[in-house]
């Protein structure tokens, strides 16, 4: 054996190993530290979960002011990118929308939405494309949204009359009226009618409220999988199962009611009068598409309507009325526009809304300051991607878009903390996510398909309220004293009631 040769070979192998080790450490360190976004220090096991606080959108904005508009957090074992700037949001929602098109898995959504068979939480793929197409083309197309006009006008008229009847009282809770309005409109459009507990024996409003609360409940098992057993001890699993069964029973009864009604020979319904259940049953029977829509999928789509519709619309109406009550000058300008364009009409219709520029500016400004979804529902990257052309983001990283922070970014808005509807006059920023300074309904593939419907309800309700009534705060309450404390959930609501004195306008 040639010993020197052996040692020489071993030395070469050793040097090669050392070189490869150094190269690996260098490139790994470079990837992990140079090209990943900056990140706050994390704790063992929980990562950065402790830094979210009770109002995550506010906590994340504060962190972004230190670490930058793109930062990396670790929520338990899950890497999460937080985007707090227009450029970062555009890169995720437009430039690389195809990469960020799927959703992380959430076990509560899975349990309540029949294995996430809805549009909102369904993972990206053929199934999601099919159900989203059904919603966009058959439930919320421009033609279909217009067909719900009578429902919107009837229910807003009912709300106006109830407020008028309550004017004898010194103070009314306007928020309660707005909540009933959105519940009734959503119920009639989706299910065909409102459901009274005394009539059906089921408190649909309470069940749906619990559904929304559970959908937003923090589930430790989603972030620290080996701790999912905690949900059994806390009773969360049992509560989710209980509400899921109640929802299923209620929705089955609604569907069966439609099936029995539609079989009656004397029953005839125009296409314009069909509700979501009618349309979905036709699709299930193969009359509109070849896609095999199962009943569980049908029910999941209906639940989406309530999760995205009721909460979002009510939340924006409540914030908008609170904003103009705090700004009497804006309220007066809004009333002058609406009453002037109404031209003495006793009732405003949707035909009158098209020229109400200040009305739309007020709604946009309220959505900027108080987006119903302060943080867009997280997305997840399906492959490695570069963010802003620099940061390396591995596959299966979640992305949170802080819409609330973007709406208050001084780089995009002058005096961002002030309520100033005039900033939206004569500019091209819309509410549908085409401009990334304002993202109340998201953008891209995962943008809310119901934005047109929501805007139609909000515009009509707001116009009719300020047309019919003069509003004031209770005696002794200054505009600046109105409680604007937030309550986070599926939507970021105002926490307190909205007490007002409403006086019918007789002009």
UniProtKB/Swiss-Prot annotation:
PROSITE patterns: CYTOCHROME_P450. It holds the Pfam family p450. GO terms for molecular function: heme binding; iron ion binding; monooxygenase activity; oxidoreductase activity, acting on paired donors, with incorporation or reduction of molecular oxygen. Its EC number is 1.14.-.-. Heme binds at residue 448. InterPro entries: Cyt_P450 (IPR001128), Cyt_P450_CS (IPR017972), Cyt_P450_E_grp-I (IPR002401), Cyt_P450_sf (IPR036396). It is an enzyme of class 1 (oxidoreductase). Its cofactor is heme. It is found in: Membrane. Belongs to the cytochrome P450 family. May have a role in maturation, such as during flavor formation or other metabolite production specific to aging tissues. This is Cytochrome P450 71A4.
